[in-house]
């Protein structure tokens, strides 16, 4: 019998404490809020919106998947549009940071980097871009979590695009699409 060493084969990773820390930011939710004037581009009006998000876990908990739908209205109640987003996030062990990918029904696709700062989860697009986004989940008040979207143009100051108050929703009360 020959004593030969077998090659070590890579094994799938398992979720660590970083995913446990991330998990509390991704419950199924509904929300209402506002979109700032110029938030959807120069000259766009102020709007209101309501939406919903449902989350699941992928690859034995290594990734969190979010599917979101939001209806937007002019301040007089006139329907403007329905926006949908598919989001996948988790701990990137190699980069030692949270990473997320997003795709929406308007043809946008992006990659974001994230971090947890106390009760806030913050994702940003990379620094080198002329238009940067920052998404923040703020659980400082656990009874009234807030989600915000901000934009930074060519290194200028961050400007609020939209802000929403979230409420927990049962998994079967939220539908994707």
Task: Name every feature range the model reports, one short phrase each.
Residues 1-177:
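Hydrophobic small-molecule pocket/channel-lining residues, especially in calycin-type beta-barrels
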């Amino acid at each position: 019998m020959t004593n030969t060493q077998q090659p070590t084969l890579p094994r799938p990773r398992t979720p660590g404490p970083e995913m446990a820390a991330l998990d509390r930011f991704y419950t199924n939710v509904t929300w209402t809020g506002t979109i700032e004037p110029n938030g959807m581009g120069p000259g766009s009006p102020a709007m209101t919106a309501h939406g919903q998000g449902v989350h699941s876990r992928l690859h034995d908990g290594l990734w969190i998947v979010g599917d979101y739908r939001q209806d937007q209205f002019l301040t007089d109640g006139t329907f403007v549009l329905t926006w949908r987003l598919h989001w996948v996030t988790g701990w990137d062990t190699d980069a030692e940071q949270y990473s997320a990918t997003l795709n929406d029904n308007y043809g946008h696709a992006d990659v974001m980097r994230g971090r947890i700062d106390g009760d806030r989860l913050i994702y940003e697009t990379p620094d080198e871009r002329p238009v940067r986004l920052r998404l923040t989940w703020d659980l400082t008040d656990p009874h009234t979590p807030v989600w915000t979207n901000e934009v930074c143009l060519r290194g200028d100051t961050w400007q609020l695009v939209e802000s929403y108050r979230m409420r927990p929703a049962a998994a079967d009360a939220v539908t994707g699409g």
